[in-house]
Amino acid sequence: MGRRKSKRKPPPKRKNIEPLDQQFNCPFCNHEKSCEVKMDKSRNTAKITCRVCLEDFQTGINFLSEPIDVYNDWVDACETAN
């Protein structure tokens, strides 16, 4: 006599982790991927600059900060200024 067939579910598939962007769209000139973030974790500062319109923004960071956080701070500062 044979065993009954197992009805156990297969293990869930792992999702691929996609890396976060390092270059962003400029909120001033609207060029795609023209803004680049430079982070200096030893000084706890980050600077984002646009290569096309030469706009820049500098902000303070902590050890958990990522380039997307600097970009979001820049966009938030633009919205509060307007």
UniProtKB/Swiss-Prot annotation:
Alphabetical keyword list: Metal-binding, Nucleus, Transcription, Transcription regulation, Zinc, Zinc-finger
Domain of life: Eukaryota
GO terms, biological process: transcription elongation by RNA polymerase II
Name of protein: Transcription elongation factor 1 homolog
Chain sites annotated for binding Zn(2+): 26, 29, 50, 53
One term under GO cellular component: transcription elongation factor complex
Coiled coil regions in record: none
Family assignment from sequence similarity: Belongs to the ELOF1 family.
Main subcellular location of this protein, as a coarse class: nucleus
Keyword Zinc assigned: yes
Subcellular location: Nucleus
GO molecular function: RNA polymerase II complex binding; zinc ion binding
Organism of derivation: Drosophila melanogaster (Fruit fly)
Physiological role: Transcription elongation factor implicated in the maintenance of proper chromatin structure in actively transcribed regions.
